[in-house]
A protein has these predicted regions:
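N-terminal "arm"/small-domain region of PLP-dependent enzymes with the aminotransferase-like
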Residues: 1-49, 56
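Conserved core of the PLP fold type I
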Residues: 29, 39-172
Length: 172
């Protein structure tokens, strides 16, 4: 057993203390206090989420100078969690995407990704991502696999902190 006090087990997707109990970061506790002091009305949000949050999130993701954003060609919706967002995306793509109904997931991918997309009605394929020997990105394998995927394929890319490896592409 590793007793180093700097060690944190993130295998379950949450911080845990040395007894295996949930550990809430001080910054999260402070955010909770600030939100509680705002005296929010606790009303339900519209089904697609908080419109100002969506606008700010789209601007953050695409950039304020994004042509599609300026032309109102970006649609957003708010969901609960990454799992919820993947399920909404999978359902939407299975019903409305007119092309290839296969989604390509990185290898490895989080354990629930495959069933989420399968249960949404998509076929799941995989592309190379992680290299165990270098403990990094297998860029050559990833590019090869994505190049060999059919045109207009659906590809799940992690914007940062690839789940479960934490390995991100670099600008190089």
């Amino acid at each position: 057993r590793d007793t180093d006090p700097r060690k944190i087990n993130l295998g379950v997707g949450a911080y845990r203390d040395e007894a295996g109990l949930p550990y809430v970061l001080p910054s999260v506790l402070e955010a909770d206090k600030r939100i509680a002091n705002m005296n929010l009305d606790k009303e339900y949000l519209p089904i697609t989420g908080h419109s100002n949050y969506q606008k700010l999130a789209a601007t953050f993701a695409y950039g304020a100078d994004s042509k599609p954003l300026k032309e109102n060609r970006i649609a957003t919706t708010q969901s609960i969690s990454g799992t919820g967002s993947l399920r909404i995306s999978g359902e939407f793509l299975a019903r409305h995407y007119p092309y290839n109904k296969e989604v390509y997931l990185p290898t490895p991918s989080w354990g629930n990704h495959r069933p989420i997309f399968q249960n949404s009605g998509l076929q799941v394929k995989q592309y190379t991502y992680y290299d165990k020997e270098t403990v990094g990105l297998n860029l050559e394998g990833m590019l090869r696999d994505l190049k060999n995927a059919p045109s207009r394929s659906i590809v799940l890319l992690h914007a940062c902190a690839h789940n479960p490896t934490g390995v991100d592409p670099t600008q190089e």
